[in-house]
C-alpha cells in the first residue's frame, strides 16, 4: 500500500473514495464543506440528513455517488466534540476509515482529517498508524486466506504535503508493533524460546544490531538461579537474549528495555486450573514481544541513544525437574527467594534480567511484563500500571504514552507492603498477601535494582483484546511498542 502526502484538498482531489472527519455539532455545512457539497451535487448534505449523522465519536456513514461525480464513494466519520479531540482521536478516526474502506473493497482513498494542535507531523503519524494497525490481521495460521477481493492500494493524506518523513517513521513504528502482535498471537508450539532467539538473530542481521544469546551454561556461570529455576522444567532450553543498538557517534544516553518472555506459562506445579485462562498463556511473553518490536523500529529510526533489549526467554512447565513450592532460589545479585508460588514465575526471570541490565551501566531501565492479574483487577483491560521510584523517568514514560495514545496509570511503591514478602528462611518470598498484588510484585522487582533509575510496566491487560476497537483488532495489540519508541526518541 502506497501512502502519500499531498497538497490536494477535498475541493480538488479526485479518486475512488473520499473520507472526511466531521466534529459533532458541525454538521451544518459551511465554508469548505459547503463548497464540497456543491461539488458533489448536494450528496454530502443528503448523507448527513438521511443517516441522521450527528458525528459522534466512532460513528460513520457511507454513500455512493453518481457516475459523473469526480468521487465514487463518500465516507464520513464522527470526531466527537471539538473540546474532547486528542491526537489519539485521529488514530481512531483513521482506523474507522480504514475498516470501512476494507469492507467496501476500496482501492484508492483520500483522507481529510483536521490537523491536531497545528502539528502536521504528529497528525500525519497518527493517521498512518490508525490506517496500518487497523488493517493488520494475522491470518498466518489459516489454511485459506479470508481476505479476498480488492485491497486498498493508495491512500492520499489531503492537505499534508511535505510529510513524507512522518509517513516513513509511522510505517517503521507500525512494523515494530506488528512484529510484537504476531509474536504474541503465535501459539506456544510456534513461538518458543528458540524461535524468539531466531527472531532476534533476524533483527540483528537485517538492521545491524549486536546480538548475544546466553545459553543455559552461560546463565549458570552468571549465577542466574532465579531465571534458571523457572526454566529447568521445560524440555526447551532457555535463551537469554541481549540485543544492542548503538548509534554511529557517541550516544547521548544509554537505556535498557527488559521484557518478560515466558513463551508459555502452565503455572508450574501450582498449575493453572480450568477456567484460569491457561489456553491464553501464549501471551505471557508480551513484554518480550514488545521489546523485540521496539528493537526493530529503533534500529531503523537510528536515534542518538544506545539501547539494550533484554529478553530472558523460557517456558514455565511441569516435569520431574520442576521447581517445587518451597524451594529457595539464589538470584545473580546473591539475594535468596523462597518460592511460595510457582505461578509467580515472571518476576523470577525478570530478577536476573534486571541485575544483568544494571551491570551494563545504563542511565535508565524499563521493564515490561504481563505480570499480575491484580493489575487488571485494579485498572481494567485498557490501562497499564506504571511503578517507578524516579519521578523524572515516570514523567518521561507518561509523556511518551500520551503521544502514543497508550494508557498508563502511575501506581504507588508502598514500601510497607514489602513486609508481607519477607520470608523467615530466605531474603524474601516471591509472592505476598493477595491485597495489593501488583504493588508487591513491583516491590519484589525493586529488590534487584541498586541505584539506576528504573520503571516497571505491568501490561497484563492491554497486551490483548477480545474485541475489535480503535486501532486494535481481536488478539494481540502490540502494546506498548509505540510508547517505548517515543520514550527512546525523546
Swiss-Prot record:
Active-site annotation: 272, 347
GO BP: any one term: proteolysis
Subcellular location field: Cytoplasm
Residues that, per the record, bind Mn(2+) 2: 260, 265, 284, 345
Record-listed E.C. numbers: 3.4.11.1, 3.4.11.10
Pfam families: Peptidase_M17, Peptidase_M17_N
Keyword Metal-binding listed: yes
Xref: Gene3D superfamilies: Leucine Aminopeptidase, subunit E, domain 1, Zn peptidases
Cofactor remark from the record: Binds 2 manganese ions per subunit.
The reaction(s) this protein catalyses: Release of an N-terminal amino acid, Xaa-|-Yaa-, in which Xaa is preferably Leu, but may be other amino acids including Pro although not Arg or Lys, and Yaa may be Pro. Amino acid amides and methyl esters are also readily hydrolyzed, but rates on arylamides are exceedingly low; Release of an N-terminal amino acid, preferentially leucine, but not glutamic or aspartic acids
UniProt GO MF annotations: manganese ion binding; metalloaminopeptidase activity
InterPro entries: Leucine_aapep/pepB (IPR011356), Macro_dom-like (IPR043472), Peptidase_M17_C (IPR000819), Peptidase_M17_leu_NH2_pept (IPR023042), Peptidase_M17_N (IPR008283)
Protein name: Probable cytosol aminopeptidase
Organism: Gloeothece citriformis (strain PCC 7424)
